[in-house]
């Protein structure tokens, strides 16, 4: 999540930024065995996701080159292209950043990169989530209002552009709230400890709570609700049509490519929603738990914490497998 520090932690660290506090070896975070395993798994998933998403983009590029030059990408393939780009962006920013930060424990890259990388991290998390919403909305409209979608060829491009724009805007506060803190002991004989955090950026604790809730809602709750509603509308519409005319069911079993394609994209959309839910739920459950109960860190084992957070990195690995299986 964007920031998950408790009010007590925020107040204590703010008072320590401009003063020296005693640092002991046991008071600072270190790279544990479970942390090393997390780093190893993170970079392994980074390689997998990079290979999978890049391969799909190359396959899509080869497909377009075989077509007539005047022919544009189909609506669905255009959506998949941007989802792949969003997943690749998340892979190239979030995974290496998480892996390297777990290795170094503290932040060595300075104030500017602290802000810029914090912005890019959240931007690259918003983009795939919003692209999933765009695909769900597009597929829902294609089934429930096919004539309106067919007559408005720019709708898909508009939703794609809006998804990228909102991702860049919603990640904007990261440039302000993140900054460096430096802790040093009284003697000045140690190099101290530096970290890229959000401490002292919120005037009141509830401002921080509101921002956390906003990012949580935009990254997970709202996209999940939209995907569930869109898939429910698709299933309801198809069920109603087939109930009114059972003979239309034969279209899905015929050699006609149009019904088969619609059924395939429906299955793909459901698979996307399932992957999104399975991969991100453990991550956000752990984040929300810590948000309301910071002491849970002392009750939940370190390996369990790392295991839950690694679930989120599976999503950009699964997505190219899903649309590679269903689309090409």
Swiss-Prot record:
Entry's Gene Ontology BP terms: cellular response to hormone stimulus; G protein-coupled receptor signaling pathway
Record keyword Ribosomal protein present: no
Key words, A-Z: Cell membrane, Disulfide bond, G-protein coupled receptor, Glycoprotein, Membrane, Receptor, Transducer, Transmembrane, Transmembrane helix
Any single Gene Ontology cellular-component annotation: plasma membrane
Extracellular side: 1-38, 98-115, 185-212, 301-306
Cited InterPro entries: GPCR_Rhodpsn, GPCR_Rhodpsn_7TM, GphnRH_fam_rcpt
One family name in Pfam for this protein: 7tm_1
Glycosylation: residue positions: 18, 102
Transmembrane regions listed in the UniProt entry: 39-58, 78-97, 116-137, 165-184, 213-232, 282-300, 307-326
Cysteine disulfide links: 114-196
Protein localization: Cell membrane
Topology versus the membrane: Multi-pass membrane protein
Predominant place of localization: membrane
A molecular-function term among this protein's GO annotations: gonadotropin-releasing hormone receptor activity
PANTHER family registered for this protein in UniProt: GONADOTROPIN-RELEASING HORMONE RECEPTOR, NEUROPEPTIDE RECEPTOR-RELATED G-PROTEIN COUPLED RECEPTOR
Known role: Receptor for gonadotropin releasing hormone (GnRH) that mediates the action of GnRH to stimulate the secretion of the gonadotropic hormones luteinizing hormone (LH) and follicle-stimulating hormone (FSH). This receptor mediates its action by association with G-proteins that activate a phosphatidylinositol-calcium second messenger system.
Homology family: Belongs to the G-protein coupled receptor 1 family.
The protein's name: Gonadotropin-releasing hormone receptor
Species annotation: Bos taurus
Gene name tied to this protein: GNRHR
